[in-house]
Swiss-Prot record:
Protein name per its UniProtKB record: Trans-aconitate 2-methyltransferase
Gene Ontology BP terms: methylation
Catalytic activity of the protein: trans-aconitate + S-adenosyl-L-methionine = (E)-3-(methoxycarbonyl)pent-2-enedioate + S-adenosyl-L-homocysteine
Keywords linked to the UniProt accession: Cytoplasm, Methyltransferase, S-adenosyl-L-methionine, Transferase
Protein family: Belongs to the methyltransferase superfamily. Tam family.
Keyword Methyltransferase (UniProt): yes
Organism: Pseudomonas aeruginosa (strain ATCC 15692 / DSM 22644 / CIP 104116 / JCM 14847 / LMG 12228 / 1C / PRS 101 / PAO1)
Amino acid sequence: MVHDLLRDRADLEARWNPSAYMQFARLRQRPVVELLDHIEPCCPERIYDLGCGTGIATELLARRWPLAELYGVDSSVEMLEEAARLPIKASWERANLRHWCAERPASLLFAAAVLHFLEDHGKLLPRLLGQLTPGGCLAAHMPNWRDASWYRLMLDALDSAGPGGASLGSPALRYRLHRRNVLSLDNYYRLLAPLTAELDIWETEYLQVVDGNDPIFDWIKVSALRPVLGELDEEARRRFLDRYLELLHRHYPRELDGRTLFPFRRVFIVASLGR
């Protein structure tokens, strides 16, 4: 298992893996549907799906608003190539969301599981709101994983799996992983309420039931774990994975039916401007 993971190093460092990401497509789609259900009925003229990935949300947006101009934006060539295979009318744009600006103002900015990768939401979200038309809407959901058991275990393994219990990776890596990008719900309210006409903020915890030999790790490795496995050298990765998999198996035992329970929290925001 560990040797197979080490052979995947190049992909983990440089590329997103669409097939691995789609392994849990149904579970990844659930928060998209929940977010869509909270958007007031409207007829958006121009929609941008930020961090569109393989197009899970883009396809649902196309079904709901088939007459809208639809754009999928992502930084990964591999993800965009996969999304472009969808039988929908959409344009695809490669861009880094840290610097991205809409060519024309958006009726709807839809951001599914992407903003948590970006820091300084105090500046980011007002900047995104500034790219909306009057009456436009920013709708986002973000994994709130900073306090999740699997995330704390990842930090524990990184901090103690080195020789003699030493830490692994650079101080800069550990700093990035300890940093909180996702704010508390009340702080999002204080940030966005003065800027919007309507604001809905909530949090949902899903009890995800997953299958496989290492389903928790399979979920994590395609997203949250990429910075760790991409930075560590081969020996450090071996030490980290040995320790981390041990901790995951201990904390997330299989149920009697052979499946694994994987609680997962997400923050949702629907912020609309006045007309």
